[in-house]
C-alpha cells in the first residue's frame, strides 16, 4: 500500500496543469515560452490571470491531496512526507512532459498546508508580503522557502522533528530550481510579475 501511495502521489504531481491550460486556451507550449516553466507565473504572463489562478489552485491541491491520501491510508508520518515529496518530484519532473515541469512552489505549499496548516499559511504570508513589496515572484518564492524550515521548527518544535529536515530539503530544492532567477536578480534583469520575460 505504501508503494502505491507514493506512486499515485508522483502521478498526481505529474499532472501538467499549466501545460494543458496553455495548450487548451492558446495552443502554446509553455516549455518553449517565457521562463519555460509550466507553473502559474508563466501561465499568468502568457495565458492570463484567471488561468494562472486555476493552475495555482490545482497545483496546490496536488501537494495537499497527496499528503491527505497518505494520512487517510496510513498513520506513518514518513509515508506522508514521502507522498508530499513524490508530488513535488512529479511536478518538477513530470513523466508526461519528459521531465520538464514547474518549480514546485505551489505544490510544496499544498504539501505543507496538509502537514501543518500554520506552517503553510505562514510561508504563504511571507510570499505575499515580499511580492507586494518587490513584485518579484521568484524573490517571493525564495524568501518563503528560506523561512519555511524556521516556521516548521517554531510551530512544531521537537514534535515530528523529521518534518524540519524535510522542510529544509524542500526549501533547498525550491531555491535550486530558482538558480537562474537568482542570477537575473543579481544582475538586475529579473522580470516583475507584471512584465513578460
UniProtKB/Swiss-Prot annotation:
Pathway: Lipid metabolism; phospholipid metabolism. GO terms for cellular component: plasma membrane. Keywords: Cell inner membrane, Cell membrane, Lipid biosynthesis, Lipid metabolism, Membrane, Phospholipid biosynthesis, Phospholipid metabolism, Transferase, Transmembrane, Transmembrane helix. It is a multi-pass membrane protein. The gene is plsY. Catalyzes the transfer of an acyl group from acyl-phosphate (acyl-PO(4)) to glycerol-3-phosphate (G3P) to form lysophosphatidic acid (LPA). This enzyme utilizes acyl-phosphate as fatty acyl donor, but not acyl-CoA or acyl-ACP. InterPro entries: G3P_acylTferase_PlsY (IPR003811). This is Glycerol-3-phosphate acyltransferase. Its EC number is 2.3.1.275. It is found in: Cell inner membrane. Belongs to the PlsY family. PANTHER family: GLYCEROL-3-PHOSPHATE ACYLTRANSFERASE-RELATED (PTHR30309:SF0), INNER MEMBRANE PROTEIN YGIH (PTHR30309). It comes from Prochlorococcus marinus (strain MIT 9312). The chain crosses the membrane at residues 1-21, 50-70, 77-97, 111-131, 136-156, 157-177. SMART domains: G3P_acyltransf.
Amino acid at each position: 500500500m505504501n508503494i502505491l501511495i507514493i506512486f499515485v502521489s508522483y502521478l498526481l504531481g505529474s499532472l501538467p496543469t499549466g501545460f494543458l491550460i496553455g495548450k487548451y486556451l492558446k495552443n502554446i507550449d509553455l516549455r518553449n515560452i517565457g521562463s519555460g516553466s509550466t507553473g502559474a507565473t508563466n501561465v499568468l504572463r502568457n495565458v492570463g490571470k484567471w488561468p494562472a489562478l486555476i493552475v495555482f489552485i490545482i497545483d496546490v491541491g496536488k501537494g495537499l491531496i497527496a499528503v491527505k491520501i497518505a494520512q487517510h491510508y496510513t498513520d506513518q508520518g514518513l509515508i506522508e512526507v514521502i507522498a508530499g515529496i513524490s508530488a513535488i518530484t512529479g511536478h518538477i519532473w513530470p513523466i508526461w512532459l519528459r521531465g520538464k515541469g514547474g518549480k514546485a512552489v505551489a505544490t510544496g505549499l499544498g504539501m505543507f498546508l496538509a502537514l501543518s496548516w500554520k506552517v503553510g499559511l505562514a510561508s504563504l504570508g511571507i510570499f505575499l508580503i515580499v511580492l507586494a513589496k518587490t513584485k518579484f515572484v521568484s524573490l517571493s518564492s525564495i524568501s518563503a522557502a528560506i523561512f519555511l524550515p524556521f516556521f516548521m521548527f517554531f510551530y512544531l518544535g521537537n514534535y515530528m522533528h523529521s518534518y524540519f529536515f524535510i522542510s529544509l530539503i524542500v526549501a533547498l530544492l525550491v531555491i535550486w530550481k530558482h538558480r537562474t532567477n537568482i542570477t537575473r536578480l543579481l544582475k538586475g534583469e529579473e522580470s516583475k510579475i507584471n512584465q513578460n520575460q
